[in-house]
Amino acid sequence: MMRGLRSLADQGMADRLLNPADAMAVAREKLNALHGHPVAPDTRVNWTELGGVRCAWVQVPGVDNASPCLLLCHGGAYIAAGGDGYLFYAEMLGRACGARVCLVDYRLAPENHYPAALDDLVDAYRGLVNEDAGEAPGRIAIIGDSCGGALAVATLLRIRDEDLPAPAVGVALGGWFDHETPSGDREADPIRDPFAHPDFTRARGLDYVGMGGDLRNPFVSPVYASLKDLPPLLLQVGDVDLTFGDAERLRARANADGVDTTFSVHPEMIHGFQGLASAGIPEAHAALAEVAAFISSRIR
């Protein structure tokens, strides 16, 4: 797998994926093309509103209302994909975890700056556990990938601070946990991770917070947050993912704050590798099996 990815990088493909020099329209076009896969005919998609926020219930065969619920904070660099573009990812998680997936179609940047996306996720969660859906919090996992990993942790912080009933767990897959100094002190090798660049994640963070916004805001970059009293966390990352150093730092912060944290590193895996399960990549399937086991072991 990695040989093929390095070959793409050597051919210059890395310059055409997640390139910080791209105009907004180009960046969106690339990200939408990466994520906009169709779902299987036997997957049910029902669009609704939770807490006034557009959401999709994605249900695969064999899953019913008694199954666990995943609240999905989608990736797409804050600027792209949207709910419609992440249905395939919700389907993939639903199949791997045997769960219903609630995909939140949060407002995108730069048209909507922080805290718009986070407000939408918190409002959707409030609707999920209150009158709109009445889901049991102990049967819910909040999960996100890439920028959605940061949003998932930020959502947990807001749930804690607003005294909402806590979900069972949080899961972050290659989360963008620090937008001010992406990847921390770790030297990134762009050939080893051809799909990510620190300047790209920083630029998208600026799109999210807007002019004059604070990239060190703990609800934007959770490495600067107090994580005390959060539910159990799974931080899963590839060891050549550009965000690896950020995940290490968040793990250290979580441990210091007494959070039950599982830190899982997958050798030779790049940013977003979990999404390759839809292409049949064994390493991605193994990662999602780990996610499923983590969630099932803690769902009440």
Give the location of each predicted region.
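A glycine/proline-hinged amphipathic helix-loop "lid/cap" segment
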Residues: 1-63, 299-300
